[in-house]
Amino acid sequence: MRAGGCTVEQALTADAANVVKQAMGLARRRGHAQVTPLHVASTMLSAPTGLLRTACLQSHTHPLQCRALELCFNVALNRLPTSTGSPMLGVPTSPFPSISNALGAAFKRAQAHQRRGSIESQQQPILAVKIEVEQLIISILDDPSVSRVMREAGFSSPQVKTKVEQAVSLEICSKTTSSSKPKEGKLLTPVRNEDVMNVINNLVDKKRRNFVIVGECLATIDGVVKTVMEKVDKKDVPEVLKDVKFITLSFSSFGQPSRADVERKLEELETLVKSCVGKGVILNLGDLNWFVESRTRGSSLYNNNDSYCVVEHMIMEIGKLACGLVMGDHGRFWLMGLATSQTYVRCKSGQPSLESLWCLTTLTIPATSNSLRLSLVSESELEVKKSENVSLQLQQSSDQLSFCEECSVKFESEARFLKSSNSNVTTVALPAWLQQYKKENQNSHTDSDSIKELVVKWNSICDSIHKRPSLKTLTLSSPTSSFSGSTQPSISTLHHLQTNGDWPVIETNTHRHHSVVHETSHLRLFIPEHDSEQKTELVCSNPNSTMNSEASSSDAMELEHASSRFKEMNAENLATLCAALESKVPWQKDLVPELAKTVLKCRSGSSTRKINGNEDKKEDTWMFFQGLDVDAKEKIARELAKLVFGSQDSFVSICLSSFSSTRSDSAEDLRNKRLRDEQSLSYIERFSEAVSLDPNRVILVEDIEQADYLSQVGFKRAVERGRVCNSSGEEASLKDAIVILSCERFRSRSRACSPPSNQKSDGSDQPEDKNVATCVALDLNLSIDSAYVCEEESCDEIGLLEAVDARFHFKCSST
């Protein structure tokens, strides 16, 4: 298609024709004989408020990424051949460069898309259909040369095209809604009762207090929220919501107030919220697009003092409400927001993002489709996930679930992921009007079997990691090394099991030969027939579990939830941490400021460690808690998990007291203890498994003074290297974990703290710990606290106390 550029205007709208004219001018200035899709794409990208640039910014939020894309297009244009006549050389050229074949094909694709997408256009002849800018952009992005340039700059053409299509659909929806007659008093899309009930059910769920409702049309979402408010006013809701008060805020008319005005309004809001603490408050923020746009234009909202921003101040104060810092643990507070999918994607961007600051979870509601349902959305993608069948199967399998709360959350997440992946595979190839019949006739046996396999898998993982003390009947961690069954294996039998690499698993196959069966439980010892072939990932902790690709990808998705909170050392983060921790342990408030500084310093990357002579940034935090106030230690650890990682589910405690003792024992007890230490998982191995399962959390290691010598050495190496190694030689990175080593004090050098060289290896029954001396002599001239400090430092021969980032002495609680 070699037609001149002036003849193209007949097939384009005014805006699209203007873009093509600018592209022709660009080609003429560069001396190019033809206008290509590269010229058009470069022209559209140069417009600061253009649709293509906006879509690219949504795909990559960093503005320098778009600058890199512009440079890549510039390089691609420089590679195009120039004609003999060039205005840069003073040689005249043709007044209108011709349209290249690639651009002509793009026009045809856009015209075809335009014709298919409009009923009015289908009734017109092909030459009468005018191409709009949106369809031109989508067609240009399909061009191979444009896709190649975008790929070089780190962009994905299909992803950017999706953003453009979403923007077009939102614009159509808003135009249709605004053109509806107000006197009719009805929305274009009727509010479905099932959507309203799902929002109410979400409000009843205690685990999902802060959420944003996402949909393609804000009018539909707003209609659902108004219906919920009407039901609350009529008391047509569950008992827990009957006295709840709605507070709706409108920020669109907020303007640019001063700092005093903002603080006054926030104080009024806080007072209003506190006045309803007994009844409950639902704070409706409305459309979150105002916050997103205001943060993007942050520089224009700054006052004369460059260190203060109105929007950031409001966001942080609302975050305190969302995190429960104002109403406390007993307050009933919900945070609700509305957003289109386009807006919510931008809520997930920024450092830190609105999603992380407000602990937002997501609900999505379709604009028109009656086949979709309001359902939970993953934090990584805005997809509708149908989890009704999974919940039913979980209820049917409730008698088989015996794992802890932490593993239960991961199990449910993996089950929903498995269900959604199966449903996507079975329905993607069918038209919408056939999918409901496919679902009715779908055989559910496969899903049921998959759920049962997940139950077995997570029961095994939880038993091997979090419920190790429950294996006392297997002699692996029992202080008395006794079986409750009728027969007791000999020492040589247990030693044989240990040397052959036994694993405690939940075994359902009754035809295993190499197993020791406990009569009262279904736990068995399974000896792999081929050790080299039975190795699995450390996160499984079970060589008999079946890990397929879907399960592995689900575990990877779990690891992606590592929070990016509190990654900067600034006054705002420090104040937030201090306020939250002091509210939990006011009697230990003297320790809080230094503790918060330690966490922020480590997480911001300010601290470094030397590895092989090189300085390496560290993000993991190591703290040593000493003292008798066990309650304060755990409260601080749990609050750090809630603040930094978003939930108290990100807290795990490893306690040695279940399988360690430092008291004087008989010869038989000492022999059994040595056998137990050799055959059970050591303290450092339990820690390494916890890190491998999920490093992005707070790990409280209790009774560290009772840990064996090798475990203490392992902890010190983990502090120095940022990685922890298990007995198999596999390493796991600590990433940004917060590790708290806790003890009352290092009182005396017990057998557990002594190096292995001090222990006898001849197997004699003499109690070698009988005449153990204390680390220091008692000096009556020293105070009790000073004596404890000196005693602890002298007992720490390994240097663990000096290796951690900070040490904190907890004074006894006054209560």
From Swiss-Prot:
What tissues contain this protein? Answer: Expressed in roots and seedlings.
Motif EAR — list its residue ranges: 778-782
Q: Where is the Clp R domain?
A: 8-171
Region spans: Disordered: 750-769
The record ties this protein, via Pfam families, to:
Clp_N, NBD_SMAX1
Using the UniProt annotation, give all residue ranges assigned to the region (Repeat 1). 12-80
Query: Keywords for this entry?
Result: Repeat, Transcription, Transcription regulation
Homology family: Belongs to the ClpA/ClpB family.
What does this protein do, in the record's words?
Answer: May function in a transcriptional corepressor complex.
Q: What do we know about how this protein assembles, alone or with others?
A: Interacts probably with TPL/TPR in an EAR-motif dependent manner.
Designated name of the protein: Protein SMAX1-LIKE 3
